[in-house]
Amino acid sequence: MTTNIHAQRILILDFGSQYTQLVARRIREIGVYCELWSWDVEESDIRDFNPDGIILSGGPESVTEANSPRAPQYVFDSGVPVFGVCYGMQTMAEQLGGKVATSTEREFGYAAVQVTGESALFKDLEATQDVWMSHGDKVVEIPSDFVKIAETETCPYAAMANEEKKYYGVQFHPEVTHTKNGLKMLENFVLNVCGCEGLWTSASIIEDAIARIKEQVGDDEVILGLSGGVDSSVVAMLAHRAIGDKLTCVFVDNGLLRLNEAEQVMEMFSEGFGLKIIHVEAEERFLSALSGESDPEAKRKIIGHVFVDIFDEESKKLSNAKWLAQGTIYPDVIESAASKTGKAHVIKSHHNVGGLPDDMEMGLVEPLRELFKDEVRKIGLELGLPYNMLYRHPFPGPGLGVRVLGEVKKEYCDLLRRADAIFIEELHNADLYNKVSQAFTVFLPVRSVGVMGDGRKYDWVVSLRAVETIDFMTAHWAHLPYDFLGKVSNRIINEVGGISRVVYDISGKPPATIEWE
């Protein structure tokens, strides 16, 4: 009998902090299932979810302003432990009778917190804690049934607690790595205060996913779009373990893949792991559908629709294929406003979620839908997939379709593939690949004058992009050595006919996104 890995659960209410997904990932690291919902969730949804504890996230608003977000009153009537982080602490204080004021000194960065009282939150921790602050308001009066449990020189109530009700608030961010013992504080809350156990492990997630797939599809056949990326590869391995040859993988060479990627995918999965794979050559079909289209969102939708059309066609060739397996992961769900509350903001329409037609004829199998990327990678390792494949830099679902700016043409894709391969090869050669979080090349649809030999020529421009990030929510451009960049530029211009200029993108996120489209 499989372990019920969802038996114990934490609910995180999102007030808009850039770190909120990080809170959820930390709870999962502790070994406990959690979900991330919008702050204005209905009371009935919280009742149905039946959490063992609730975390109120940080956020950019000010509690002192009218109509700023508040926690549903049921949070404090439910009888479960509550942990407020930054804005979450402030709204907890305000809603329970305390006072919040705008601080004369905004605290941003490292701070030394002095623990002033015993608390379950700080169990087994020293009296001075290095933490990460990011706030403009502060609690100036705590509710009458709370006690102060920590302070800083400029923040009189850095943490507060009502031990009887199991309510806790901290003005800092325990979820970020800058807070040295932040994970221990979250462990104290989730394991000790809420009484959860570490049921959420890679082994138990695999066991649960296999059981769910078997239960969902029965004796039906399943079709999976295998791209060779992390998500679809892990789904393929899970489904293969669950239903064996009732899984048919469709590998679509859409003309938007990296150099030699098609050959590598077929070799690994068909020959190496023995999966049943149909190889569809569809470059012309995708490029024809994309012809004349330059809008990024429209390109994503077109690519998604053509994929589904191909799967539909291939499934009709199978006697009993009623299910389409997908590599949708939890951040896709959150970002595409397809979360269970439906209140998340659309950032980009992910091909796995927003681009699917309403009249799709197959049911969906999405075994990774509850998982973050780091969890998917850990599962992949346990399933026997190679480290280098699982920890390769992220590649967007629409592939080069969103790395060729504007209209997508075969000529542009071929040039970009070769330029990108040189960039990645040189990163490996210089031992820089694993020191950046993501690196790739972008094709710019503009011609620039160049000099070759005694003549002038007008050829295309590509941009190199490399970023460093912990969570991909924010990112810094990578300060790659000038000599390295010069070498990459020279190789691309000399070896890839048709490119006359190479530039380097030095934009951070924000204001820019990591991908250009």
From Swiss-Prot:
GO cellular component, one term: cytosol
Coiled-coil positions: none
EC top class, as a word: ligase
Entry keyword set: ATP-binding, Glutamine amidotransferase, GMP biosynthesis, Ligase, Nucleotide-binding, Purine biosynthesis
Residues reported to bind ATP: S227, G228, G229, V230, D231, S232, S233
CDD domains in UniProt: GATase1_GMP_Synthase, GMP_synthase_C
GO molecular function: ATP binding; GMP synthase activity
Residue span(s) of domain GMPS ATP-PPase: 200-392
EC number annotated for this UniProt entry: 6.3.5.2
Recorded superkingdom: Bacteria
Pathway: Purine metabolism; GMP biosynthesis; GMP from XMP (L-Gln route): step 1/1
Ranges that cross the membrane: none
Catalytic activity: XMP + L-glutamine + ATP + H2O = GMP + L-glutamate + AMP + diphosphate + 2 H(+)
Pfam families: GATase, GMP_synt_C, NAD_synthase
Active-site residue numbers: C86, H173, E175
Ranges where the Glutamine amidotransferase type-1 domain occurs: 9-199
Summary of subunit composition and partner proteins: Homodimer.
Function: Catalyzes the synthesis of GMP from XMP.
NCBIfam families linked: guaA_Cterm (TIGR00884), guaA_Nterm (TIGR00888), PRK00074.1 (NF000848)
Full protein name: GMP synthase [glutamine-hydrolyzing]
